[in-house]
Amino acid sequence: MAQFYSPNRRVTTKQTLTVTVNSLDPFGQGVAHHQGKAIFIPGALPGEQAEIELTEQKRQYSRGKLKRLLNRCNERVVPACPHFGICGGCQQQHANSQLQQMSKADSLQRLIMREAGACPQLDPVICGSEYGYRRRARLGLLYQPKQHRLQMGFRQTESHDLVCIKHCPVLRPELERLLLPLYQCLSGLQAVRRLGHVELVLADNGPLMVLRHLDTLKEVDRAALIDFAKREQVAVYLAGDSDNVEKLIGEEPYYQIEGLRLAFHPRDFIQVNDTVNQQMVAQAIAWLDVQPDERVLDLFCGMGNFTLPLAKLAREVVGVEGVAALVANGQYNALNNALPNVSFFHENLESDISRQPWATQGFDKVLLDPARAGAAGVMSHIVKLAPKRVVYVSCNPTTLARDSQVLLAAGYRLAQVRMLDMFPHTGHLESMALFMQEPGVAK
């Protein structure tokens, strides 16, 4: 998620104002203006008049707390979650999905235009269901000795405190139904005071959980977890430390993409929103327009979410990743899916990839999917490879806009941009962009 504003605060004298909200920022905050300064107001929507209390004042902007709405806009809806406003997981359930997507898309277009100097008309937003989409979640666990009670939930807004969660409508239904029986199971463990967190993941072959415990579990607790797993049909993994995971019971997880089966480790990164991921991969394939005689490079490839589907179309695909475990997983999946034309390499992506032995033959197309920090150290090396097309998948519009400047300066054209509504009701803004080689760029 891009950070557009400094989080540092300055205490001010409380001042009450009546303002009209003009727009919604990508994080779901209403934006009003007073005396030439923007005011960000959580909970307020465009077109609404609101009575607010200023809580923070900076030179360029202020923040306000919503005290009272004087009218309600048509885009305001009733949040589906009883914890909304307290739980920090979602910020925008009070706005309908059309308004959320429009505000994020507008922010994306403005940012790219400002940083890169050009932005084509955005293609329609890639999206899925606004609820029931999350196939992965991590819940904190904390035992309260005075109440003799376990807390299980997400962090409160702007706090480290937990909100006890019994329902979470953004979770896939297969995971949400586990919340209550899971809480009851964990509350009954002898090790209840020494639990850290629990991760829930929905694989295509069923749900799994990873329990972080701080002491060795006794046999009675292991038996209780096995009973829970059998009763709820959940695979259970135990994490006695932050590095190692022990399978207690269940099948190895996998998910399917473009007709391929990708096995993954319970702690491997997989895209949270399966529906959007399927569309995202299909769009990347269409934009790259891979031909049977072409070589394709996939940077920041992970375990092969894009790499392996591309290998079904290209003569050869090379995936490069900085995490060794993901490289091993990609190699395993290439073998299991009978794709001998794909190779995975563990490399420092800040080094000059154009000088690597596997790059000497060059590449016709390049895809990259970096983390939030972007790919500043990689862009100049991509230019050296002179691919005909580059697809950049981004989870941070600020670094996408920054990195695109390198390609534009090298003669590439920003041909298409799409926003991905990967995380409805949150401030996360994901996108993808296609850059095409213009005539005169050497190959």
UniProtKB/Swiss-Prot annotation:
It holds the Pfam family tRNA_U5-meth_tr. Keywords: 4Fe-4S, Iron, Iron-sulfur, Metal-binding, Methyltransferase, rRNA processing, S-adenosyl-L-methionine, Transferase. The keyword Cell membrane does not apply. It catalyses: uridine(1939) in 23S rRNA + S-adenosyl-L-methionine = 5-methyluridine(1939) in 23S rRNA + S-adenosyl-L-homocysteine + H(+). GO terms for molecular function: 4 iron, 4 sulfur cluster binding; iron ion binding; RNA binding; rRNA (uridine-C5-)-methyltransferase activity. GO terms for biological process: rRNA base methylation. It is an enzyme of class 2 (transferase). It comes from the Bacteria. S-adenosyl-L-methionine binds at Q271, F300, N305, E321, N348, D369. InterPro entries: 23S_rRNA_MeTrfase_RlmD, MeTrfase_TrmA_AS, MeTrfase_TrmA_CS, NA-bd_OB-fold, SAM-dependent_MTases_sf, TRAM_dom, U5_MeTrfase_fam. Residues 10-68 form the TRAM domain. Its EC number is 2.1.1.190. Transmembrane segments: none annotated. The active site is at C395 (nucleophile). [4Fe-4S] cluster binds at C81, C87, C90, C168. Catalyzes the formation of 5-methyl-uridine at position 1939 (m5U1939) in 23S rRNA. PANTHER family: 23S RRNA (URACIL(1939)-C(5))-METHYLTRANSFERASE RLMD (PTHR11061:SF49), RNA M5U METHYLTRANSFERASE (PTHR11061). Belongs to the class I-like SAM-binding methyltransferase superfamily. RNA M5U methyltransferase family. RlmD subfamily. This is 23S rRNA (uracil(1939)-C(5))-methyltransferase RlmD. It comes from Yersinia enterocolitica serotype O:8 / biotype 1B (strain NCTC 13174 / 8081). The gene is rlmD.
